Curated annotation (Swiss-Prot):
It is an enzyme of class 3 (hydrolase). Belongs to the TRAFAC class translation factor GTPase superfamily. Classic translation factor GTPase family. EF-Tu/EF-1A subfamily. GTP binds at residues 19-26, 81-85, 136-139. PANTHER family: ELONGATION FACTOR TU, MITOCHONDRIAL, ELONGATION FACTOR TU-RELATED. CDD domains: EF_Tu (cd01884), EFTU_II (cd03697), EFTU_III (cd03707). Monomer. Keywords: Cytoplasm, Elongation factor, GTP-binding, Hydrolase, Magnesium, Metal-binding, Nucleotide-binding, Protein biosynthesis. It comes from Rhodospirillum rubrum (strain ATCC 11170 / ATH 1.1.1 / DSM 467 / LMG 4362 / NCIMB 8255 / S1). Residues 81-84 are annotated as: G3. This is Elongation factor Tu 2. The gene is tuf2. Residues 10-206 form the tr-type G domain. It catalyses: GTP + H2O = GDP + phosphate + H(+).
């Protein structure tokens, strides 16, 4: 079977199912493909096809993730579903599967459970912009008042983690009813209602190209008679020849002008998100720039040394540490293209961190790095990855 060409006629959006174990995330994923397949917007994938998620590696960490794609009238979606709780934690922290929005699945029979909380907190910390709730297994609850109580509880929980609990769409239904065609209203209709809510409520993500220009510097060359060239892959935005840009991180911020953009030995008028380019910098000396700095649109990003983050610490089996660590632990933090040493401060009441834990902590770096919330990094010891993290908020 030859792969169909991916028609980019509709806007694209990345979503995922999150929620407590056995609340029906994978069943819902299967149900969405089933219902949308009837309208020709998907290929039906049964529960066990999705449940056998292949392993992937992201930032040196093995994660099992299932990828499903489907489309509604409005958009094309890539949907991620993870088999185990640990996979969700790793996925959200490493950003292996980017989520522009998430569907929080809560069993109406159980209400919010510990992992429901944890996934909402993680979504908040890693910057998932919007959530939609599917109240699953409603066919198991006869009492309308009980359903309303569960809905209220979910809304209060969302509000307590700074999501707009009163405004978030909550759709009541049953993934199983949709898969077994046993109840039109709770099954088929609820899935369509859910997808309409996902279409309407999860904002269309800004394309990387439309964001302010940023390029991590990978290498620096001096070309006689022309000046200094820095190379790297443009992470976001566009840089045009003749534009003023800033060099940020490690040292004091410098201003310069991009006087040339080269790709595959050809001169271009501009470089854009995804391009591997060489940028010629006016009046910049070879020794003024280094790997680990970034080129960026002036004023769009600032250098910082202290931040709060959410991190996952690898287990011994994953190639991580064999022993716990304590406050004042000093590993390297690998941002984009370089390692910077930093000191970890654990939250009050946390004595130590064990391999396999995920933890919120504060980090103080010895040199400033261009950062904003949502920036991913690896935690390393002597070049070996021992953890992964994401910047939740900047302290200074």
């Amino acid at each position: 079977m030859s792969k169909e060409k991916f028609a980019r006629t509709k806007p694209h959006c990345n979503v995922g199912t999150i929620g407590h174990v056995d609340h029906g995330k994978t069943s819902l994923t299967a149900a969405i493909t089933k219902v949308l397949a009837e309208a020709g917007g998907a290929t039906f994938q049964a529960y066990d096809q999705i449940d056998k998620a292949p392993e992937e590696r992201a930032r040196g960490i093995t994660i099992s993730t299932a990828h499903v794609e489907y489309e509604t009238e409005a958009r094309h979606y890539a949907h991620v579903d993870c088999p185990g709780h640990a996979d969700y934690v790793k996925n959200m922290i490493t950003g292996a599967a980017q989520m522009d929005g998430a569907i929080l699945v809560v069993s109406a029979a159980d209400g919010p459970m510990p992992q429901t909380r944890e996934h909402i907190l993680l979504a908040r910390q890693v910057g998932v912009p919007a959530l939609v709730v599917f109240l699953n297994k409603c066919d198991m609850v006869d009492d309308e008042e009980l359903l309303e109580l569960v809905e209220l509880e979910v809304r209060e929980l969302l509000t307590s983690y700074d999501f707009p609990g009163d405004d978030i769409p909550i759709i009541k239904g049953s993934a199983l009813a949709a898969l077994e065609d046993s109840d039109q209203k709770l099954g088929h209709d609820a899935i369509l209602e859910l997808m309409k809510a996902v279409d309407d409520y999860i904002p269309q993500p800004e394309r990387p190209k439309d964001k302010p220009f940023l390029m991590p510097i990978e290498d620096v060359f001096s070309i006689s008679g022309r000046g200094t060239v820095v190379t790297g892959r443009v992470e976001r935005g566009i840089v045009k020849v003749g534009e003023e840009i800033e060099i940020i991180g490690i040292r004091d911020t410098q201003k310069t002008t991009c006087t040339g953009v080269e790709m595959f030995r050809k001169l271009l008028d501009q470089g854009e998100a995804g391009d591997n380019i060489g940028a010629l910098l006016r009046g910049t000396k070879r020794d003024d720039v280094e790997r680990g700095q970034v080129l960026a649109k002036p004023g769009s990003i600032t250098p910082h040394t202290k931040f709060k983050c959410e991190a996952y610490i690898l287990t011994k089996e994953e190639g991580g540490r064999h022993t716990p660590f304590f406050s004042n632990y000093r590993p390297q933090f690998y941002f984009r293209t370089t390692d910077v040493t930093g000191t970890i401060e654990l939250p009050e009441g946390t004595e130590m961190v064990m391999p396999g834990d995920n933890i919120g902590m504060t980090v103080q770096l010895i040199a400033p790095i261009a950062m904003d919330e949502g920036l991913r990094f690896a935690i390393r010891e002597g070049g070996r990855t021992v953890g992964a993290g994401v910047v939740a908020s900047i302290v200074q």
